Amino acid sequence: MCIRDRQGPFPGDPVAALPPVHGTFLDAARRDPGRCRVGYFTRPPLAHVEIHPDVALAMTATLAAIEDLGHEVVEVSPPFNDSLLPMFTALWSSLALLTPIDEEDEGRLQPLTQYLREQGRAISGNELATAVSMLRINSRAAMTATAHLDAVLVPTLAQLPALVGQLRDDDDPAADFAAQVAYSPYCAGYNISGQPAINVPMNWNSDGLPVGVQLVGRMHDEETIISLAAQLEATHDWRHRIPAMW
């Protein structure tokens, strides 16, 4: 329902979820996707990041399920790498400055937000423009590299679901930001490229926690990944599984 109501561009949007080509998004969920070629990579785009064994296991299990459904799986290299991190950080820090805050109210902000705003003030207009341009160029290269695939399967997170406040470090907001980057190294590149992606909780670890992986689609092709996700759900129904801690 959310994607249905938000389909199409708002004035000025650089990217948007276009209306489906064949019927509705609900129709896509009910439609067999046909035989797809699904690329995958497990290695994090950031070299210093390690993934939890349960995340790797979720990838292995999901790839097996995809093959069992008759699809082809192809290992690919991560289309994003460490070179994007400084550019992403420049953009993220600048975005923290979009909301004007009175100087006397700055101290009321979360330390991480204060830190990002401080970093953003140190970035010149030329540096920000360069970062945005390089991110767009890399996004085009990433989409070109995977254009022969119907979808790409990657982990959603590098670690298991975090406890509330687990990553927060008010005493060292730089460490807080670094922890968040290491926790979620896979999503940022696709958030920047604007490609559609859908999380599927295909695997559950021994503690009863869902471990998600995500299907990333071609630009403006929500339909294929919705069909694939629905097909996986039909054969590995997770709708009624609830973690014990809930």
Residue ranges and their predicted role:
Residues 4-57, 80, 235-246:
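A short helix-breaking turn/cap at a secondary-structure junction
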Residues 46-59, 63, 126-132:
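Active-site pocket-shaping loop/turn-to-helix segments
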Residues 72-77:
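General small-molecule cofactor/ligand-binding pocket signal
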Residues 143, 175-200:
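Small-aliphatic-rich amphipathic alpha-helix that forms the alpha element of a beta-alpha
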Residues 209-218, 225-226:
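Short, well-ordered beta-strand elements
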